[in-house]
């Protein structure tokens, strides 16, 4: 059931992406307050919800995105935003974790990495993880043939988890927090059914796209 103060537009934008993100972070990775969480692709539908869910759990959130989306990641609650198109993006993330570690009095590194990018950024994510940390994956938008340096897995006791969709109860939990105003859908734009081709073109190019695109029937 959609909470009374959640619009149909927001519910439509949230249905799959909110569920996927909630299951990744809460159901699979089981995030806890104070952890350092890396959200890859924070400008995507799942990434935008991932940022907010991690902040809901009082985690320190580092989001990656293309340059034009960094400010919006910060607006959603990310504590830091890093341009993942840079070759050395992981070095910037590592430097941030070192500063956070000083404040928290713990070892530097990422506790949970939230990934749906896949091949191009896979191994660099592994280098950023703490001992016993978790990388949870729900997709592979840049390719599925990721090469894994197993030294980063067995020497660090790394947990690599797969995740897809989620349960009805998890969706209800996410929608509850939307109803409380703690999580919101990032809706980039709305198109009519007659504009579907235009919407698909925007989705495929990804230029300036942040969050979800909605298709609405006339009069809805």
Where on the chain are the PLM-derived regions?
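Phosphate/diphosphate ligand-binding glycine-rich loop within oxidoreductases
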Residues: 1-5
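Mid-domain Rossmann-like dinucleotide-binding core that forms the NAD(H)/NADP(H) cofactor-binding site
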Residues: 7-87
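A general structural signal for well-ordered alpha-helical segments in protein cores
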Residues: 18-21, 90, 122, 150, ...
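Local beta-strand N-terminus motif with an aromatic residue
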Residues: 34, 78, 106-110, 183, ...
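Anion (oxyanion) recognition and catalysis
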Residues: 55, 154, 179
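Glycine-rich cofactor phosphate-binding loops and adjacent beta1-alpha1 units
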Residues: 62-65, 72-159
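C-terminal hydrophobic helical "lid"/dimerization subdomain
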Residues: 168-220
């Amino acid at each position: 059931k959609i909470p009374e103060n959640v619009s149909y537009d927001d519910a439509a934008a949230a249905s799959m992406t909110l569920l996927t993100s909630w299951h990744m972070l809460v159901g699979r990775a089981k995030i806890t307050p104070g952890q350092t969480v890396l959200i890859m692709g924070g400008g995507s539908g799942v990434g935008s919800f991932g940022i907010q869910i991690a902040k809901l759990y009082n985690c320190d959130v580092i989001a990656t995105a293309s340059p034009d989306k960094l400010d919006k990641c910060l607006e959603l609650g990310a504590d830091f935003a890093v341009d993942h198109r840079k070759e050395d993006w992981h070095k910037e993330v590592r430097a941030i974790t070192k500063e956070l570690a000083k404040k928290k009095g713990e070892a530097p590194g990422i506790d949970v990495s939230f990934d749906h990018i896949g091949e191009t950024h896979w191994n660099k994510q592994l280098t950023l993880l703490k001992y016993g940390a978790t990388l949870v994956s729900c997709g592979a938008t840049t390719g599925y043939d990721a090469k894994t340096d197993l030294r980063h897995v067995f020497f660090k006791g790394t947990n690599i988890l797969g995740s897809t969709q989620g349960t009805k109860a998890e969706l209800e939990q996410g929608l509850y927090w939307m109803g409380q105003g703690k999580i919101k859908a990032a809706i980039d734009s709305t198109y009519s059914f007659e504009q579907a081709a235009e919407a698909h073109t925007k989705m495929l190019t990804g230029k300036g796209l942040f969050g979800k695109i909605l298709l609405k029937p006339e009069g809805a």
